[in-house]
């Protein structure tokens, strides 16, 4: 039985707890033993992107120590963006002979949820059933930096009753970009409006994504414009399907 420490991420922990819960239930359904290190905090990405690299190192050290104490075989998180930051910890400590090997060990066992299910557990069909017409938003960090493109599609393609429709300009950023949406709101709004237009043109009833930050941004814009499109994290889709199956 694989032992997994849940990296819940800030947004799942504070704003979208159903994503964290779905992640745990899904992993347990797939035979994993899941633990939750309560001392975990933010991964440090907002600070890093804002240029506070020394402060980010303090956060990274705390996260490395926290998950070392958990002593799990794997660290799994429902966010490509946050997992990417944890995978990049060795870069923060590239000139530190003490912390670099610890950061490398930490990064090596850290996985995004769909990547872990498909590549590590070698599962592409979780037995889900979710009748809906949906489209998938591919988040930037997950595809461009982690290189995860096939895994979400493999899992969603095997969900009974789920019809996936293509999304135009699927690799275009949604405009969130962490602190980017705060620093450059006018540009961010234009970007998310383009994403919303693509979603509407797809004819989908449900928008699925693997990063809560993107879903929060796109979902907020859909709601503001009065569009009744449901927004769901891929963990919720797969888990709800498992519950119905």
Swiss-Prot record:
Please list which residues make up the signal peptide. Answer: none
Its domain of life reads Bacteria
Can you supply a Gene Ontology BP term from the record?
A: lactate metabolic process
Q: Name one GO molecular function term.
A: oxidoreductase activity
Instruction: List the InterPro entries.
Output: Cys_rich_dom, LutA
Gene Ontology terms, cellular component aspect?
A: cytosol
A Pfam family of the record is CCG
Disulfide bond annotation, renumbered to this chain? none
Name the job this protein performs.
Answer: Is involved in L-lactate degradation and allows cells to grow with lactate as the sole carbon source.
What family does the database annotate? Belongs to the LutA/YkgE family.
Q: What is this protein called?
A: Lactate utilization protein A
Encoded by which gene? lutA
């Amino acid at each position: 039985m694989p032992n997994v420490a849940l990296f819940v991420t800030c947004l799942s922990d504070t704003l979208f707890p159903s994503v964290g819960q779905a992640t745990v239930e899904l992993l347990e359904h797939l035979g994993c033993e899941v633990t939750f290190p309560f001392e975990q905090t933010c991964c440090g990405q907002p600070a890093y992107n804002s240029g506070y690299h020394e402060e980010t190192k303090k956060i990274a050290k705390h996260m490395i120590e926290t998950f070392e104490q958990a002593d799990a075989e794997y660290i799994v998180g429902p966010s490509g963006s946050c997992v990417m930051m944890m995978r990049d910890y060795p870069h923060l400590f590239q000139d530190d002979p003490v912390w670099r090997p610890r950061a490398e060990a930490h990064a090596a066992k850290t996985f995004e949820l769909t990547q872990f299910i498909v590549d590590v557990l070698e599962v592409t069909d979780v037995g889900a059933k979710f009748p809906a017409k949906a489209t998938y938003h591919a988040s930037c960090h997950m595809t461009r930096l982690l290189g995860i493109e096939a895994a979400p599609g493999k899992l969603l393609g095997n969900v009974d009753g789920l019809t996936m429709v293509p999304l135009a300009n699927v690799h275009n950023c949604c405009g969130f970009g962490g602190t980017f949406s705060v620093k450059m709101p006018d540009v961010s709004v234009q970007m998310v409006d383009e994403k919303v237009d693509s979603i509407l043109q797809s004819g989908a009833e449900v928008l699925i994504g693997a990063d809560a930050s993107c879903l929060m941004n796109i979902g907020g814009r859909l709601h503001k414009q009065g569009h009744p499109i449901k927004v769901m994290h891929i963990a919720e889709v797969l888990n709800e399907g498992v519950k119905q199956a």
